[in-house]
Amino acid sequence: MTSAASHSADVVIVGGAVMGSSAAYHLLSDPGFKGRVIVVEKDPTYQLSASALSAASIRQQYSSAVNIRISLYGIQFLRSIGDRLAVDGDRPEIGLKEGGYLYCASEAGASVLAENQALQAAEGADILFLKPDELKARFPWLNVEDLAAGTWGRSGEGWFDGWGLLQAFRRKARSLGAEYVKGEVAEVEREGNAVVAVRLKDGTRIACGTLVNCAGSGGRALAEMAGVRIPVQAKRRYVFTFSCKEPVENCPLLIDTSGAYARPEGEGAFICGASPEADVDPDWFDEDPASQEIDFSFFEEFIWPSLAHRVPAFEAIRPGRAWSGPYDMCLLDHNAIVGQAGDVKNFYLCNGFSGHGLQQSPAIGRGLAELIVHGVFRTLDLSELGYERVLANRPLLERNVI
């Protein structure tokens, strides 16, 4: 971390985790950008960052074309990360494993799964629609008695080292000239319809030509400092680990009809989780130690029974460690808010990823850089994710939310 000695930058990015670091990297990689980039990060250990605490996976199985396209680029980026983010010949490794996602559906959900798969295939994603006998043939350990269908990502989906991705983006951005400053924004200064500076809690003032909000769980508060309201709330999510002695061969990231999920994490080891019902979904506050508490009854009473029903081998498991982390939920439609912030012409939003941030970071960082440097999206049109839909109360509905 450096100090902002000259107190000015062409672009100030608030939030130095995976999204902010991706934006910094893509900005400084653009031949059309010649400016200075300062990334303000309040906790350079990233101890409570969603990037570090995520289940770190990527899928193409969305119900909206823009999300599918974002992830199609994302998997291309992750496959070639060693070339893209190498620094002085040191190629980062993120242990990408393309084991696929397996969505399970009952009779009630089968038609939606079929519609989604048709769109995914039309966009070029390698997703198969499987009937119960086909599911059983591919995954003999799976209980299909109450299933009507499933969709499985034959390629292009899987999991990886999220911490490794964050560090690779950060290291590459710094090698290109990004300056990381430890600090927390206390104030955003505006003159008319433009942001002119941010002031940190230690009193440091950093003038800026452009301000980018990649502040994660602090994104709503930062937006409000700039006079912008976004429907984003940080929610608490738990990740539980367990081990299973009985082999569950070629296990993908399994999503049960109940919403519980599990994926392999090494030989005989798994991680799992689920989203609570809305009326019992706890908020997350970075400064509140209670936000880091773990509700083990949620695992014992809901997640474990759901997974054991779907995979009988999971009836006899050994629970392991667990952790909680922030999940920055877009309350409008569970989709990210990306782009220029309404009337504040030089303030850009990158918030509310609702659990999709790691996998979407390559495409979103690239898109933000294009918008800042060129004024338009040049490669992948992300305008459907823009702030305009918030102002118009026009949700971009996504049916595949975990």
Kindly label every feature range from the protein language model:
Residues 162, 305-402:
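C-terminal catalytic lobe of FAD-dependent flavoproteins
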Residues 65, 69-72, 103-112, 152-171, ...:
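Short beta-strand to alpha-helix junction loop
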Residues 244-346:
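Active-site lid/adjacent beta-loop-alpha segment flanking the redox-cofactor pocket in flavoenzymes
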